[in-house]
């Protein structure tokens, strides 16, 4: 957390140095205005980050026992929210802006960016501007900021209220308008329709399914108004097990799903892991928080890539347990038999659907360096009880 705060403060200080260094030169007024946009943006990101972690900081000071838990939660937020990536993207944009202006002013920039550190690249560009300013005389002409002109193809941009900014009709580039409020009509009910959130959050789906796959969901989900604790359901399942002479220790996810279908309780398919734990006394593995966080990050990236590469015309909804299965199958070592038991608690769909999912997953893996593609192997049902 301290590292992120220091990074935000260092970026703000660097932006301030650049603006102060160019303020005396009239020919750079347009550039300063453009840099101000990124300066405001990084300040807003810094403020948002502090707002996110502030409740956890308050909890951390309330007791020693909560401190480790709070620190882990803040680390998870930093990873999931891609804080480092957001800072780097802003620095890359600023570096591109400076490099473009330097090239326009006749300064050779080729081969000057030999580092992958965006912070160092921006500082290098700043130093080059100092050299350029020393060799040029101050001029008094004034430029006007053409904020509606696309910086890539110089086409007039149009307002796009869904993206909260200007969009180029030619290349599709979007320029965010900081501090501008649009009519948010999509947040109001029309003709009795239910208002929906316009923000898709893959992390919420990941946490929901991980909670259910690991059997950490509430036991009240098994119940009804007449049977709050789900005792009746468990009794019905035990009768079927006894009738069919099934070995409780060898029960699988597919066994439980078939029995739930028989008693017309397929609404409990999401609770199979919890039911298995109640019946067998053996639950899913308790995977460490670091592995779960890594899985959450890869899951988020995979869903984003899927939205870009998904096959046209395919209307099937995302089956998120499949993604979780593929991720943990890839990141858990083959000899880690304890944690790999999680694969036994994930239901895989039919062969045709699985083949389609594997084909789509192969396309995702091409843009996901963390995962190496391989076809799904159904022989994971080897028991380690």
UniProtKB/Swiss-Prot annotation:
Presence of the UniProt keyword Zinc-finger in the record: yes
Keyword list, A-Z: Late protein, Metal-binding, Zinc, Zinc-finger
Induction (record text): Expressed in the late phase of the viral replicative cycle.
GO biological process, alphabetically ordered: regulation of viral transcription
Name of the protein in question: Zinc finger protein B385R
Zinc finger boundaries on the chain: C2H2-type: 166-190
Pfam short name (any one): A2L_zn_ribbon
Molecular function terms, GO-annotated: zinc ion binding
UniProt superkingdom: Viruses
Family indicated by similarity: Belongs to the asfivirus B385R family.
């Amino acid at each position: 957390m301290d590292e992120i705060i220091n990074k935000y403060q260092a970026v703000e200080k660097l932006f301030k140095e650049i603006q102060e260094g160019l303020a005396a030169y009239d020919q750079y007024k347009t550039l300063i205005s453009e840099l101000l946009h990124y300066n405001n943006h990084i300040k807003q990101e810094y403020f948002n980050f502090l707002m996110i972690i502030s409740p956890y900081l308050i909890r951390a000071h309330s007791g020693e026992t909560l401190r480790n838990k709070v620190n882990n939660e803040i680390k998870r937020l930093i990873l999931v929210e891609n804080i480092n990536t957001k800072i780097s993207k802003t620095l890359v944009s600023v570096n591109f802006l400076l490099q473009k202006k330097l090239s326009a002013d006749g300064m050779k920039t080729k081969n000057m960016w030999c580092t992958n550190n965006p912070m160092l690249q921006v500082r290098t560009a700043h130093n080059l501007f100092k050299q350029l300013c020393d060799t040029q005389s101050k001029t008094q002409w004034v430029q006007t900021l053409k904020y509606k002109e696309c910086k890539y193809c110089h086409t007039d941009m149009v307002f796009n209220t869904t993206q909260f900014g200007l969009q180029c009709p030619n290349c599709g580039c979007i320029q965010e308008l900081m501090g501008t409020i649009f009519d948010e009509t999509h947040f109001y009910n029309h003709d009795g329709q239910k208002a929906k959130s316009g923000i898709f959050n893959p992390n919420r789906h990941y946490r929901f399914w991980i909670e259910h796959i690991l059997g950490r969901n509430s036991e009240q989900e098994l119940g009804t108004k007449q049977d709050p604790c789900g005792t009746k359901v468990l009794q019905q399942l035990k009768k079927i097990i006894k009738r069919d002479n099934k070995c409780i220790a060898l029960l699988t996810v597919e066994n439980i799903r078939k029995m739930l279908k028989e008693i017309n309780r397929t609404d409990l398919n999401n609770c199979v892991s919890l039911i298995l734990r109640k019946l067998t006394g053996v639950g899913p593995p308790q995977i460490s928080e670091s592995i779960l966080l890594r899985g959450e990050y890869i899951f988020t990236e995979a869903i984003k890539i899927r939205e870009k590469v998904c096959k046209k015309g395919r209307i099937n909804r995302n089956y998120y347990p499949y993604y979780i299965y593929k991720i943990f199958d890839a990141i858990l070592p083959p000899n880690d038999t304890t944690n790999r038991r999680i694969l036994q608690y994930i239901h895989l769909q039919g062969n045709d659907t699985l083949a389609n999912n594997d084909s789509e997953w192969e396309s995702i893996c091409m843009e996901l360096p963390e995962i190496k593609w391989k076809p799904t192997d159904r022989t994971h049902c080897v028991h380690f009880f």
